[in-house]
Amino acid sequence: MMLASLTIGAAAQNADSTRVKNDSIKVFSDYESQPQFRGGQEALKKFISKNLKYPDAAAAYDVEGSIIMTFIVNEDGSLSDISAHDCKIDRFNTTKFSQETEARQKELKQQFALLFAKEGARVIRKMPKWAPAKRYGKAVRVKMHQPIKFIDPSK
C-alpha cells in the first residue's frame, strides 16, 4: 500500500466563471458551498491513501514526487476533465542515477512523472461522486486541485 502525504483541502479555481470545452458549459468559483468528498477531508485522505499505489518502477531508483491533480466536480457530483499538473520529482537515489547518462536521467525523470500522473488520474477516476458546490442554492460545476505526494513505502 502506498504512503501518501496529502495537502488536504482541495482548492477551487479563482475566477468568477470559466468556460470549459465549449461556450455552453460554465465552471464556477463563486459559490456558497464548496464541493465536498462524501465524508469530508479525513475520508478523502483515507480514500487516497488506501487506493494510491506507488509505481514499482519508481522503487528501483527510490524516486519520490508530487503532483497536482485537477478535475471538475459536476452538478451531479461526478468528476470529469481529470488532468495532472506540476509533477515534480522531489527525491531520487543519486548513486543509481549517477550511473546513467544525462540523457537517460532526463528520460527516467519524465517516465516517473508520467507514472505519477497516470496513478493520480486512476485514483481520481475511482472516487465516488462528491457533494457538488452550490451557487444560489443550485448545484454548479467547480474546478478542483488536489495535491498528491508519492513516497516510497519501503522507506
Set out the residue ranges of the language-model regions.
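N-terminal signal peptide c-region/cleavage motif recognized by signal peptidases
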Residues: S5-G9
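Charge-biased low-complexity segments
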Residues: A10-K155
